[in-house]
Amino acid sequence: MRPGGERPVEGGACNGRSELELLKLRSAECIDEAAERLGALSRAIWSQPELAYEEHHAHRVLTHFFEREPPAASWAVQPHYQLPTAFRAEWEPPEARAPSATPRPLHLGFLCEYDALPGIGHACGHNLIAEVGAAAALGVRGALEGLPRPPPPVKVVVLGTPAEEDGGGKIDLIEAGAFTNLDVVFMAHPSQENAAYLPDMAEHDVTVKYYGKASHSASYPWEGLNALDAAVLAYNNLSVFRQQMKPTWRVHGIIKNGGVKPNIIPSYSELIYYFRAPSMKELQVLTKKAEDCFRAAALASGCTVEIKGGAHDYYNVLPNKSLWKAYMENGRKLGIEFISEDTMLNGPSGSTDFGNVSFVVPGIHPYFHIGSNALNHTEQYTEAAGSQEAQFYTLRTAKALAMTALDVIFKPELLEGIREDFKLKLQEEQFVNAVE
């Protein structure tokens, strides 16, 4: 180990640049060399949007990309990894493939998303997420392959993770053990700004059904039990409750079913609600209070109520300051202008199943500008995500991720800091590290 805490990189320094800096430049060159193939990959996914768990075309495009990526057979691809539309592609230096290879390779994961939204296609730019993950992995592999001597033991893993928008494919993969051996994970999400981190919130969704009794609305309404009244009461209960909600809590919902005809007392109604909070602990408090509002509406209307939570809760994304600082340092060298840390920590955010990943393995989920001020989940953002202009920003972000991954490989003190940040955040959240 050399004085700066870096592992030596074979090949020497040149023109005053460190060996690691030269390796980072090579990773960026590898991404540029693959730019045409990566852009075609993104366009193929964007042009045929598919909903959660139904991403068969995108899955086929991505697995074929890695199966055919030169040099031949450099990636070991498992095309239907734990889920029908998930995949796993692995690369490691030939020396590390020997049964006697020691020590255990460092496993770095790059995540791809590729599901779309109903009606408006890739309005969240998941085609670009897939491209970033693939490009960053190619950059790391290309840089390490160019070393004249074997690199440190490392395995590059690309995980295709379906169903982020609905269902939580990453949570399914966590439960199947897909993240068990990964040391650090990387992905990036398109947005309106460049942020190394945003405080994505914990989220719980719920379907509420009220059962009443039908009757003629004019002739004998007193014989009925109005399930729509129960739904309206529930909606109003939550509206009143907002006065006591913390400013960081979010509650939003719709009445999905409110009856069939005005002259029939509705015997059935249905609501769908999403609850969000900065932490799982706060989310549990919010959910309990909201469910009390639903039950009170049933009591007042004489109806019965059924409250059913979604298949998975999305956890809040744990920040990893060591990792995001390394990413910002690399990004700035590429010309990325990041929002301030204060704006980053207090800015608006949504929810993602990457939050669940961040509770089992340290990782980074930065956001990147794609050359448009359009807002996510709009038709305008769909257009922007498929534009040629977005390609420059997407590949620049992939380069920053690849460079950060190289820092993790060659700077042991950075990896130590990442792991320490991870443990401290888990302790703050009062969660046990599922990896250990």
Curated annotation (Swiss-Prot):
One Pfam family, short name: M20_dimer
Q: Which InterPro entries match?
A: Bact_exopeptidase_dim_dom (IPR036264), Peptidase_M20 (IPR002933), Peptidase_M20/M20A_hydrolases (IPR052030), Peptidase_M20_dimer (IPR011650), Xaa-Arg_dipeptidase (IPR017144)
| Regions annotated as coiled coil | none
Give the matching SUPFAM superfamilies.
Bacterial exopeptidase dimerisation domain, Zn-dependent exopeptidases
The record's listing under Gene3D superfamilies reads: 3.30.70.360, Zn peptidases
Q: What does this protein do?
A: Catalyzes the peptide bond hydrolysis in dipeptides having basic amino acids lysine, ornithine or arginine at C-terminus. Postulated to function in a metabolite repair mechanism by eliminating alternate dipeptide by-products formed during carnosine synthesis.
Does Kinase count among this protein's keywords? no
Instruction: Name the PANTHER family for this protein.
Output: PEPTIDASE M20, XAA-ARG DIPEPTIDASE
- Provide the protein name: Xaa-Arg dipeptidase
Q: Which family does it belong to?
A: Belongs to the peptidase M20A family.
Q: Which UniProt keywords apply?
A: Carboxypeptidase, Hydrolase, Protease
Catalytic reaction equation(s):
beta-alanyl-L-lysine + H2O = beta-alanine + L-lysine; beta-alanyl-L-ornithine + H2O = beta-alanine + L-ornithine; N(2)-(4-aminobutanoyl)-L-lysine + H2O = 4-aminobutanoate + L-lysine; N(2)-(4-aminobutanoyl)-L-ornithine + H2O = 4-aminobutanoate + L-ornithine
Task: Give GO terms: molecular function aspect only.
Answer: carboxypeptidase activity; dipeptidase activity; identical protein binding
Per the record, the GO terms for biological process are:
proteolysis; regulation of protein metabolic process
EC numbers listed for it are: 3.4.13.4
Specify whether Disulfide bond is a keyword of the entry: no
The GO cellular component terms are: nucleoplasm
